[in-house]
UniProtKB/Swiss-Prot annotation:
Gene3D superfamilies: 3.60.21.10. The keyword Transmembrane does not apply. InterPro entries: Calcineurin-like_PHP_ApaH (IPR004843), Metallo-depent_PP-like (IPR029052), PPA2-like (IPR047129), Ser/Thr-sp_prot-phosphatase (IPR006186). The keyword rRNA-binding does not apply. Its EC number is 3.1.3.16. CDD domains: MPP_PP2A_PP4_PP6. It comes from Paramecium tetraurelia. One of its GO terms (biological process) is double-strand break repair via homologous recombination. Mn(2+) 1 binds at residues 51, 53, 79. GO terms for molecular function: metal ion binding; protein serine/threonine phosphatase activity. This is Serine/threonine-protein phosphatase PP-X homolog 1. Its cofactor is Mn(2+). Belongs to the PPP phosphatase family. PP-4 (PP-X) subfamily. The active site is at 112 (proton donor).
């Protein structure tokens, strides 16, 4: 068995990798991610997943429902870490799968794949607690800078963590951003990870303090101009697992059931077949969530 296969087995068992192995894994992942474009072209069939937020045992449920890699192709929309108790295992397993099966799993960046955010919402503290050093946090946050910003499925479905930006009109404009940096406090890269849709016209400031809020007219014009039929995003809790808006021109997919171990929501994944027919698969939290054994304060859920 190769090192990477051994690491995958170790992580699937909920065990931590050695610090030296984390460094090797993160370096391998950076080499692969470095060769990917800002906007990744993905071919259906593919299964799209929203926020995971360190809920490792629920990620295991997700794979039970959706199928294992490489039999199923996956596109994850970011926010792998923070909030949940097992961000280390969650992120490293997804990275290991990416290294082992680079064409079967696509990872894009969420607003929590950020040094600043992880220092507040759990990942930083978890790394320190599990490894008694910040090295693992540093290795992982270096990988964050290499993650793609968006994906397009079959030139028809635009996938992003948060939403749109008033500073761009076309997907091609995303392709020329310098993404290999900490998430900025403003600008296109920030907006892609922080913005939200709402029942408004045009644009407005976001209560999150980053990104914007955008309405149906913005979505329909963006979709028309770019020749796409749907924006698929995550970033906001959907109590029913997913939420369609604006005459089905935008969908939010949420993949962290019983978010923060208290919200009571179901989760979903969106399966697209080769003809882009959509199947929303719902799932609930893992029956025995060992992650809850460690007690800690969880910040409010709206970031």
């Amino acid at each position: 068995m190769s090192d990477i296969d051994q690491w995958i087995e170790t992580l699937k068992n909920g065990e931590n990798l050695k610090e030296t192995d984390v460094k090797i894994l993160c370096n391998k992942a950076k080499d692969i991610l470095n060769n990917e474009d800002n906007v990744i072209r993905v071919e259906a069939p593919v299964t799209i997943c929203g926020d995971i937020h360190g809920q490792f045992y629920d990620l295991m449920e997700l794979f039970k429902v959706g199928g294992d890699v490489p039999e199923t192709n996956y596109l994850f929309l970011g926010d792998f870490v923070d909030r949940g108790y097992n961000s280390v295992e969650t992120f490293l397993l997804l990275l290991a799968l990416k290294v082992r099966y680079p064409d079967q799993i696509t990872l894009i960046r969420g607003n929590h794949e950020s040094r600043q955010i992880t220092q507040v919402y759990g990942f930083y503290d978890e790394c320190l607690r599990k490894y008694s050093t910040l090295n693992v946090w540093k290795y992982c946050t270096e990988v964050f800078d290499y993650l793609a910003l968006a994906a397009v499925v079959n030139d028809n479905i635009f996938c992003v963590h948060g939403g749109l930006s008033p500073y761009i009109k076309t997907i091609d404009e995303i392709r020329i951003i310098n993404r290999k940096q900490e998430v900025p406090h403003e600008g296109v890269m920030c907006d892609l990870m922080w913005s939200d849709p709402d029942e408004i016209e045009g644009w407005s400031q976001s209560a999150r303090g980053a990104g914007f809020v955008f309405g149906a007219d913005v979505v329909k014009e963006f979709n028309r101009r770019n020749g796409i039929s749907l924006i698929c995003r995550a970033h906001q809790l959907a109590m029913e697992g997913f939420k369609l808006m604006f005459d089905n021109s935008l969908v939010t997919v949420w993949s962290a059931p019983n978010y923060c171990y208290r919200c009571g929501n179901v989760a979903s994944i969106l399966e697209l077949d080769e003809n882009l027919k959509k199947y929303y698969k719902l799932f609930e939290a893992a029956p025995t969530d060992r992650a809850q054994n460690s007690k800690k304060v969880i910040a409010d859920y709206f970031l």
